[in-house]
Regions:
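Tubulin/FtsZ superfamily GTPase core signature
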Residues: 1-136
Length: 136
């Protein structure tokens, strides 16, 4: 789980600048203002269970966030993939199950090409406490 605002801003900038199949735009990012927490989960693309392991890491981060915050208002999800791995169609139901199990009001996602040798998924969450209108 990442809470450092500068690191999160760098991650958001990467989302916009990465060559994409499904694009995240600057307008999408403008909707994420405060209370930002991020997950940056990676696994070597050579691992046949790479995407499964990434989802397991994301699931742990999601649970950690919900242990501290009452709700996740928004999610910005970016799936990075290497040319060597190329997300398999059978990876996608697992990913959709993860997204469906996050109690979230809205989300936007993108898919882009990653230069590294890892499968990587970055999620920026806007989380809030239920007893406050403020985001944390």
């Amino acid at each position: 789980m990442i809470k450092d605002a500068k690191k999160i801003q760098t991650m958001l900038h990467e989302m916009v600048e990465t060559p994409s199949v499904v694009r995240i735009t600057k307008e999408d990012i403008k909707l994420f203002r405060e209370g930002l927490i991020a997950s940056d989960c990676r696994c070597p693309a050579s691992d046949p269970q790479a995407f499964v392991k990434v989802i397991e890491q994301l699931e742990k981060d999601r649970q950690d966030i919900l242990n501290v915050h009452d709700c996740i208002q928004k999610m910005l999800i970016y799936v990075y993939d290497t040319q060597e791995h190329c997300l398999m169609m059978d990876d996608m139901p697992l990913f959709h199950d993860f997204v469906d199990n996050v109690p979230c009001r809205e989300f936007k996602w993108g898919v882009g090409q990653w230069k590294g040798d890892e499968v990587r998924v970055v999620i920026v969450y806007q989380a809030a406490l239920a007893d406050s209108s403020q985001s944390f």
